[in-house]
Amino acid sequence: MSKAPEDQRPMPRRPAAFSLEEPSSSPARPPFAEAQEPQRRAPKSFDANVTITPDAEDPFLAGLSEDEAILPIARPAKRRFSFGKLAGAAFGALASFAIGLWIDDLIRDLFTRADWLGYTALTLLGIGLLALTVVVIRELAGIYRLNAVQAIKQRASALSLQGTASEARKLVKDVEDLTQHRAETARGRSVLKAAENDIIDAPHLIALAERELLAPLDAKARSLIINASKRVSVVTAVSPRALVDLAYVLFEVVRLVRAMAELYGGRPGSIGMLRLLRDVFAHLAVTGSIAIGDGLAQQVLGHGLASRLSARLGEGVINGLMTARIGIAAMDLCRPLEFKALRRPGIGDFMPALKPAINPDSKAL
């Protein structure tokens, strides 16, 4: 084995001494760290006057049109003492006495003619009274269900501000019982059942119930309103007489309000239906919501569109929008929980459904 020549061997390094700097107490930071951290400002006091501008005087909020603003929520009218109701009850009782005396005299006369006629009249009277009792019980049950919906809504509003989880669970159970007849709420009921042992405060539990139970019902309610508005718009556009328009609009409104009440568990009878219709129209009369907003009217009839549309078609669109507004008011009254976790629908949400009817270039025309 041959050795490497001496001139090619590496020179050994001689020992040397080095001075080590003492480590600093804080670790070194990269040069860009100071740029990333915001500089803290020492607290100061300001003597400038702060003026709060009310919403009514705010120029950025004053320009909102009626359609962009939040529509008023329909609420049931307060029950007050009325002399008209008192007079109606008094004359109704008097008429009942008169009918009772007439029936008594009739049965007595039938017994004087023949016994079998008297017994037949008594049997018919018993059948009639039994049927009347069933009708009265159904009407009272319908009114009770409507009152229960409003009671649940008031309890939910109070518990959303201040309430315990146990009270909120009782409220959610009442809402489940009210809507269990609808197959759309099956998934929501299973979600709420799975969350029974979870720790949830009252407002969030009510919001969860609204999203899981009422969201599918709200979608169904929207479809009911859209279909009713379309039918009213088309019938108004093709009907030959204004009386036909009015009759069909009233028929469609009554059917829409009844379907809305049955959807949310109200299921009113005839008397309860009249009461619900009175609350709906009272809300629309007080708020002036039957008339559409300037922005929406300009969208439907403005920009030269009125000159290209027939008068009947314009009336059909307006009646369809009015039907949609009535449907929204009925939705507010029949819904067991107010719109908080979910967005409340507005008239603008139903405009796309009526757009084929107001578009002059549409094939529907």
From Swiss-Prot:
Q: Which InterPro entries match?
A: DUF697, UPF0283
The record describes its membrane topology as: Multi-pass membrane protein
Record region (Disordered): 1-47
**Bias category Basic and acidic residues: which stretches?**
1-10
Where it sits in the cell: the answer is: Cell inner membrane
Q: Which GO terms describe its cellular component?
A: plasma membrane
Query: Transmembrane residues, as ranges?
Result: 83-103, 117-137
Q: Which domain of life, per UniProt?
A: Bacteria
Give the UniProt keywords, A-Z: Cell inner membrane, Cell membrane, Membrane, Transmembrane, Transmembrane helix
Which NCBIfam families did the record assign? hyp_HI0043 (TIGR01620)
Q: Which family does it belong to?
A: Belongs to the UPF0283 family.
**What is the name of this protein?**
UPF0283 membrane protein Avi_2471
| Species the sequence originates in | Allorhizobium ampelinum (strain ATCC BAA-846 / DSM 112012 / S4) (Agrobacterium vitis (strain S4))
